[in-house]
Amino acid sequence: MKTLFFATSNINKINEVKQILDIPKIKIEIPQNFDIKETGKTFKENSLLKAKALFKILNNKQPVFSEDSGLCIEALNMEPGIYSKRYDQYKLGKKLDNNEKNHLIIDLMREKNNRTAYFICVISYIDVDGTINNFEGMLKGTIALNIDYYQKNGFGYDPIFLTTNNKRLSELNLEEKNKISHRGIAFDKFKKFLMQFLD
């Protein structure tokens, strides 16, 4: 059994990732109270930052992986981007709940004709010997004109993101979402990479 340590404390990410990386002989462990300041300028930099921090915490002896992801909107100069999780504080200097954050995006997009947006995910994996591999995934879509208040699934910006078949991410169950999402695509690449080293 190979144990991988996932550098996150986000329960939503943990649930999505555990479903995708459901591989026999691989166990995913979550560190307790893991919280690293994301000071990178790109998704890749932030992902590496988290992976390297956890690798160091585990005395450079355990395989670790991390991911950084976010929403990039063309009409907003690719914001929220790396600030997706804390866009409220970046833009307004105060903390908002998920619905309020989605309202902020809808308001900023009110006069915009170009509603093209992308969800981007970068995974960084550090093996026991210190070798680093990165995996990327992207989902293209558009920003909706309003919020799905009846969301049954998803989290974050899912209620305002329309996929190319005009469905909100919040309308999809976890299995459906993982088949098309940025995170699903990136972790599928990571999964294929890991499978090479299993008996």
UniProtKB/Swiss-Prot annotation:
Q: Which cofactor does it need?
A: Mg(2+)
Gene Ontology cellular component annotations, sorted alphabetically:
cytosol
Q: How is the cofactor bound?
A: Binds 1 Mg(2+) ion per subunit.
Reactions catalysed, as given in the entry? XTP + H2O = XMP + diphosphate + H(+); dITP + H2O = dIMP + diphosphate + H(+); ITP + H2O = IMP + diphosphate + H(+)
Alphabetized, the UniProt keywords read: Hydrolase, Magnesium, Metal-binding, Nucleotide metabolism, Nucleotide-binding
Q: Which annotated residues bind Mg(2+)? A: D68
Give the matching InterPro entries.
Answer: dITP/XTP_pyrophosphatase (IPR020922), ITPase-like_fam (IPR029001), RdgB/HAM1 (IPR002637)
User: Which residues are noted in the entry as substrate-binding?
Assistant: T8, S9, N10, I11, N12, K13, S69, F155, G156, Y157, D158, K177, H182, R183
Q: Which SUPFAM superfamilies match?
A: ITPase-like
User: Under which EC number(s) is this enzyme classified?
Assistant: 3.6.1.66
Indicate yes or no for the key word Hydrolase. Answer: yes
Domain of life of the native organism:
Bacteria
Tell me the GO molecular function terms: dITP diphosphatase activity; ITP diphosphatase activity; metal ion binding; nucleotide binding; ribonucleoside triphosphate phosphatase activity; XTP diphosphatase activity
Which residues are responsible for catalysis?
A: D68
> Its Gene Ontology biological processes?
nucleotide metabolic process; purine nucleoside triphosphate catabolic process
Entries under NCBIfam families matching the protein: PRK14825.1 (NF011400), RdgB/HAM1 family non-canonical purine NTP pyrophosphatase (TIGR00042)
Q: Which HAMAP family does the record cross-reference, listed alphabetically?
A: Non_canon_purine_NTPase (MF_01405)
* Job of this protein: Pyrophosphatase that catalyzes the hydrolysis of nucleoside triphosphates to their monophosphate derivatives, with a high preference for the non-canonical purine nucleotides XTP (xanthosine triphosphate), dITP (deoxyinosine triphosphate) and ITP. Seems to function as a house-cleaning enzyme that removes non-canonical purine nucleotides from the nucleotide pool, thus preventing their incorporation into DNA/RNA and avoiding chromosomal lesions.
Record-stated family: Belongs to the HAM1 NTPase family.
Q: Note the PANTHER family from the entry.
A: INOSINE TRIPHOSPHATE PYROPHOSPHATASE, INOSINE TRIPHOSPHATE PYROPHOSPHATASE/HAM1 PROTEIN
What interactions and quaternary structure are annotated? Homodimer.
User: What is the protein's given name?
Assistant: dITP/XTP pyrophosphatase
Source species of the chain: Borrelia duttonii (strain Ly)
